[in-house]
Structures are given as structure tokens and as C-alpha cells.
Regions:
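N-terminal Rossmann-like FAD-binding beta1-loop-alpha1 element of flavoenzymes
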Residues: 3-28
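Dinucleotide-binding Rossmann-like beta1-alpha1 core, especially the glycine-rich loop
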Residues: 44-119, 128, 256, 293-295
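C-terminal lid/capping helical subdomain adjacent to the catalytic/cofactor pocket in oxidative enzymes
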Residues: 2, 23, 328-382
């Protein structure tokens, strides 16, 4: 019998499995699809501090950034400490970006308009300036999930970690109000602890245990270009509107210019956000808008072909904070979901914090802001 079952083999579930195995626990990971078959496989691989408001999520991001750098020495998942450049079209927006960077208290360099081309020679002229964040990084998310799982087996014992894909969890088993395991299409698996790392489907898993988590899908599209012969973009580059959209509560369509290159030479173009359920219908108007915004940032992209697009669903929480920790309503149930667009970046810290709880140790950060029952408490106090 495993010590803990992790539901979800995306990058968050993989990180939970890695750190729990490192802590000496026997772990079974279950997923109805393949490893990284959900939101992880539709992500750009961002590890950002630049888009975080000062507070609990930024604290998570800073620790997770350091953990990603450590993990990059354990496994190869195309970790790039490339830095992020946030650009502004007007002086007013530039000043707002500068104020945010100061409040964040993170490493940054304010860049005047005349200095932008030292960072990105192919940027469009006329921008008012921006802020460069050297800590912003990127990984290949599917590689990260797969290789974290592989590293856990190789470093901490093949028998300590079992990964079972194509196995759908049908229910969470309890006795006396406490978790005793899960029910799957292949039978029941017993364990004293279950981690809900089901991402956008985290609310469904929580409901199986009789608790509510208001996690909603927030759709986003990404365009992928043909590989470029010569590097065109050095960093992750995005407009100030991206920061605004990340913090938005709107269910309607919001887009912002986001452009970055990959080690293979392709360019990833985003970003869009909208709450339309799990509708995967390709939206040509959205893709056209993304392409236009990218060309506005980098005019040379007008001569580059887009070869494909894809969409994914970010796990959105109403207060824009992830759900991390033990659920007091059902002892033995732990949550690691609701990270919205920051799941890849926050995966290691999520896994580390939960491994501390499972091992009976003090977490590295205060988990109170991320507690699973905070939404029920908010409703009761209205």
C-alpha cells in the first residue's frame, strides 16, 4: 500500500511525487491520460516572478524559482534562465510597471525606451520602455513532468514510485470521515493520503471527497511558428496588458502580446484568456489577434509562418491564489491545484510544501493564504 496517491501526472503532480519520494514516502501517481496530457502539455513553460503581485503568490514564486534552478541540475528539461522583458507603449504605463517592480522587491532593471534594443534588437520602435526581470525563466513543461518522475525513480528507488497512466479515478474512499484511498476503473487503491493535483479538474476530484473547490477552466490559445534559422527573440517579451489580464476576474476574452523563442527555434505567441467552459473550438479571430499583437512587437515576424496552434485550460480560482495544503474537512486529503497560469512555475514549491506536511514537518512558507477551506469560510462570513 502506498503512503500517498497523487491524482494527476502533470507537472504539479510530478513535483508532488518527486518531493514526496525524496522524503522517503511510497507514492502512486494516477492519471486518466498520459503524463503531461492536460494543462501542462498546453503551457509555454513559464517560471515568472514578473507577473506576480507582492504577497503570498510572489513568495511562492521566488522560492519555486530557486527550486527550478536546483532541479535543472537533476534532470534536463530545457531550463533557460532567459529573463523576462515587460514593455510599455506609453510613459504612464512604463511608470506603473516601475512602481510594481519596486513594490515586488525582486531583481529588476528599469529600461528606458532608447535602451530596449540592447535587450531585444528586433523590437518595434517607439516603445516607451519597460522592466527587465532576470529571474524569469522557462522550461519545456512536458519534459519537466516526465523527467521529474523519472528522476524520482532513479534517485530514490523504482519501487518507491509507481506511475499508472490511463487509470481514471472514480471516487475518493473514506471511512469515519478520513481518506482511505481512491476508487478507479480498475478497482480500489488504498492509501492514508491523497493529493489532488488534477489541475483544472481539481474541483471534480474535490467533489468526489464531498468538498467544494471553485476551480474553473480559463481557456488560452498559443500560436507556434516555423523554426527560425537565426535567433530573433532573446527573452520572454510581453506587454504590460499581460500583467493586468493575469489579475483580471473577467470571464470575457482578454488578450495581450506575449512572444518567446524555444531551444528548437520555434516562437511561441500568446496570450489569451477567457472562461468558456471546456470548449476546445479553435477561434480564428483570437489567433488573428495574437498574431497581430506579436507582429506589433516584432515586425520581422510578419514574414514568419505560423505552423500550428493549440489551446489549454488554466485552473482559475476566484481569488487568484492556488489551493495548497491539507483539507481540514477531510483528513488525509491534500490539494495542489488552482494555480491558473502559474502552475508550471509554482510546481516545485507546491510539491516541496506538501512533502513537508506529509512528513510531519514545518512547511517552508505559511500555507494559510492557500488553505483549501478558505472559499467556504468566505461564503459563511458574507
Amino acid at each position: 500500500m502506498p503512503d500517498v496517491i497523487v491524482i494527476g501526472a502533470g507537472v504539479v503532480g510530478a513535483a508532488c511525487a518527486y518531493y514526496a519520494t525524496r522524503a522517503g514516502l511510497d507514492v502512486t501517481v494516477l492519471d486518466r491520460g498520459p503524463v503531461a496530457g492536460g494543462t501542462t502539455g498546453a503551457g509555454e513553460g513559464n517560471i515568472l516572478v514578473s507577473d506576480k503581485e507582492p504577497g503570498p503568490e510572489l513568495d511562492l514564486a521566488l522560492l519555486s524559482n530557486r527550486l527550478w534552478r536546483d532541479l535543472s541540475t537533476v534532470a534536463d528539461f530545457e531550463f533557460e534562465a532567459k529573463g523576462g522583458l515587460v514593455v510599455a507603449e506609453t510613459r504612464e504605463v512604463r511608470d506603473t510597471l516601475q512602481d510594481l517592480a519596486i513594490k515586488q522587491g525582486v531583481e529588476h532593471q528599469v529600461v528606458p525606451g532608447a535602451g530596449l534594443h540592447a535587450y531585444e534588437p528586433h523590437l518595434a520602435p517607439g516603445l516607451a520602455g519597460g522592466v527587465f526581470y532576470p529571474q524569469d525563466s522557462q522550461v519545456q513543461p512536458m519534459l519537466a513532468a516526465a523527467r521529474l518522475l523519472a528522476a524520482a525513480r532513479e534517485r530514490y528507488g523504482h519501487s518507491a514510485l509507481r506511475v499508472r497512466t490511463g487509470v481514471e479515478v472514480k471516487g475518493v474512499s473514506t471511512a469515519g470521515g478520513r481518506v482511505t484511498g481512491v476508487r478507479t476503473g480498475e478497482g480500489e487503491i488504498l492509501a492514508p493520503a491523497v493529493i489532488n493535483a488534477a489541475g483544472t479538474w481539481g474541483g471534480e476530484v474535490a467533489a468526489m471527497a464531498g468538498v467544494d473547490l471553485p476551480i474553473l477552466p480559463r481557456r488560452g490559445f498559443i500560436l507556434v511558428t516555423e523554426p527560425l534559422r537565426e535567433p530573433l527573440i532573446r527573452h520572454k517579451v510581453y506587454t504590460a496588458a499581460y500583467v493586468t489580464n493575469v489579475a483580471s476576474d473577467s470571464a470575457g476574452l482578454e488578450t495581450s502580446g506575449v512572444v518567446e523563442a524555444t531551444p528548437s527555434g520555434t516562437v511561441l505567441i500568446g496570450a489569451s484568456r477567457e472562461r468558456v467552459g471546456f470548449d476546445r473550438t479553435t477561434s480564428l479571430p483570437v489567433l488573428s489577434r495574437l498574431a497581430a499583437q506579436a507582429v506589433a512587437l516584432f515586425p520581422a515576424l510578419s514574414a514568419v509562418r505560423a505552423i500550428r496552434s493549440y489551446c489549454g485550460f488554466r485552473p482559475y480560482c476566484p481569488d487568484h491564489l492556488p489551493v495548497i495544503g491539507a483539507d481540514p474537512r477531510v483528513p488525509g486529503l491534500y490539494h495542489a491545484c488552482g494555480h491558473e497560469g502559474a502552475g508550471i512555475g509554482l510546481a516545485p514549491v507546491t510539491g516541496l510544501l506538501l512533502s513537508r506536511l506529509l512528513a510531519g514537518e514545518q512547511p517552508d512558507l505559511d500555507l494559510h493564504p492557500f488553505r483549501p477551506d478558505r472559499f467556504a469560510f468566505a461564503r459563511e462570513t458574507r
